Amino acid sequence: MAILLKNGLVYQEGEFIKEDVLISGSKIQAIGLDLPEEGAEVYDLKGKLLAPGLVDIHEHYREPGFTYKETIKTGSEAASRGGFTTVCTMPNVDPIPDDLETFEKQVALNEANSCVHLKQYGAITEDLTSDKVVDMAALKEAGAFAFSNDGHGIQQAGTMYEAMQEAAKVGLAICEHIQDDSLYHHGVMNAGKKAEELGLPGILGVSESAQLARDLVLAQATGVHYHACHVSTKESVELIRIAKEYGINVTAEATPHHLLLSEEEIDGNNGYYKMNPPLRSKEDQFALIEGMLDGTIDLIATDHAPHSREEKAGDMRKAAFGIIGNETAFACLYTKFVKSGQMDLSLLLDLMSYQPAKLFGLDAGVLAPGKEADLAVFDLDHAEKLSEEDYLSKGVNTPFTGQEVYGMTALTFVSGKLVYKSKHFAD
């Protein structure tokens, strides 16, 4: 059956236009006014924003191995509630997809359980911590989206150089968790005034920027597409800015939590504020925002990382690193930056859809006839209080719970199929 989305504010090619969208099967059939309703299931959007489905290139689903934290089903359902229709998942599961057989099993598991388009990262090295680079050609053939050891920085320059050479040969990106362990010192939050106040071990900002500087030189030497994951420091933003001026093939992401929060917002010794990289200083936060606005930061990615309540309870020294975010990212960012006038809505949408799709060669992020009907409808006028009871993720580990936000998702369609409908939507 055809689906007609009426009276939407459609975001198309950088413009917002009041028009309708007709879906036939898995594709967008037409965009315009007065499209035929006969034989179609009709949704009256009543002026809500109709946008390309969002694209998140950095999420952690814990299946197989850690399904008490999250499953592919719950993670993808949470993503759909956040308006995401394409998601790329990291390889820190058990077993790790670092060889062809394991990777193919992971892809089959993803396809059987996800309600959104799910792209799978391959590991850069075996076990995510060794110095043996995986068979990248074989993993690309099996469908690898890119390569990452996320959660672990690659410590040896020679290993990274070899990995970059191999990734460049197969034409896929190296997406790096930037962390020099010799400068990391097993900290639990940013090394700064807040850590001193709480008596907690700190993580130096230079543990990120020093390794980033090394990697940018190696990327220049190899020509690989090097992607800097969850950038968090002022120095990292400046290094990326300079690297782009030199023509190095580097892209970078920032997370919603690093854009929205700094260490100053940390509410005591609270495990829900423990993430890696940590929340940095206000100066770092402002540098990230500036980088987002001037194009140094290419895209926003959630780093959705669910854990059990027990793993996040209490003391930061014992709590796991990570924060959930795929259900709340767009609404929190819209409320903070767009409603306040700091940022255009078109830029936010591009950073969360068009940009990641374009930079990583994904067929997503654009609304046009003939394209896959991956769509998200956002209610920009309805205020909603974020509540644990509403989360579709198994994880509730976020400090944003209790905040009132605008722009939560009303409807999400993946390949023309309705995969999420808000309890607040009345058509």
Curated annotation (Swiss-Prot):
It catalyses: (S)-dihydroorotate + H2O = N-carbamoyl-L-aspartate + H(+). The keyword Zinc applies. Zn(2+) 2 binds at D150, H177, H230. Its EC number is 3.5.2.3. Its cofactor is Zn(2+). GO terms for molecular function: allantoinase activity; dihydroorotase activity; zinc ion binding. This is Dihydroorotase. It comes from Lactobacillus leichmannii.
